[in-house]
Amino acid sequence: MKAIILNEAGSVSNLKYVDIPKPEINDDEVLIKVSALSINPVDYKTRSSEERINRLFGDERPVILGWDLSGTIVGLGKNVSQFKLNDEVFGMINYRGNGKAYAEYVAAPASHLALKPENISHQEAAAGTLAFLTAWQALVTNGKIKEGDKVLIHGASGGVGHYATQIAKHFKAYVIGTSSEKNKEFVLQNGADLHIDYAKADFENEVSDIDLVLNPISDEINNRSINVVKPGGKIIYILGEIAPEYVEKAKNKNIDLFAVFVKSSGPDINTAADLMQKGIIKSHVSQIFSFDEMKKAHLQLETGRTVGKIVIAL
């Protein structure tokens, strides 16, 4: 099968196309013939950092990146009862760990998958995996979002942000989304009640009394967001470590500032399937690249200007 491997961290030129045997599956896995996969900022950040590769893959080299996929089951482990051959499934597999999704065939834990709704494409399904799960686990699992909450979503036109906006509206929250001016209509179409152009206005001067903030941008945004959150509110950061002084500053104002790291979840990906099947959540796929264009897809994502999601079609 075709696969893309990485021997060491570096630029996109380090992504190498190879022919390797199809993976063997264990008793709790299925073999998936991949129709589409999705890439996220973690893909290029891992590709370019030996430290990140070590954190996710240990000493294994070469590695195969990728966690988000949609495709058809062509092999079943003996313990798998929830799926059958030829079922179309999707999911974020083995995150944070060794997903190996940059390949024509992938061995995936059955517990990380859901049946793909018949009314959405493989591309839409693959898009709605890591980014959807990140938004869901941040806002719902950890943020405890509820009807009437005033929610501020930074980067509302991005992969995580555009799902977060839709999720927040599903919970009947009042949603404020930040993005560039050119993506204003997209953010509002996703359900935001108010849009803030971050280039023209400091959000601190535009909003106050926020219950819940989702921050997929930077730690400095955490610091600035403290100024607009009401006592008892939450700021959720999805990019990693938070400066201790920001956590202390938030604590002094009775604000809970913390990081959330997405993880593979069968129940959550089945929630995604249900919401997509009902049309409540929609994936916005802004660009589709072929498997042979993976390097170009990484470069596009690295611009930081992608609206919605980038998908690779096989």
PLM region spans:
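Terminal helix/beta-alpha structural elements that buttress the NAD(P)+-binding lobe
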Residues: 1-26, 33-70, 75-76, 81-314
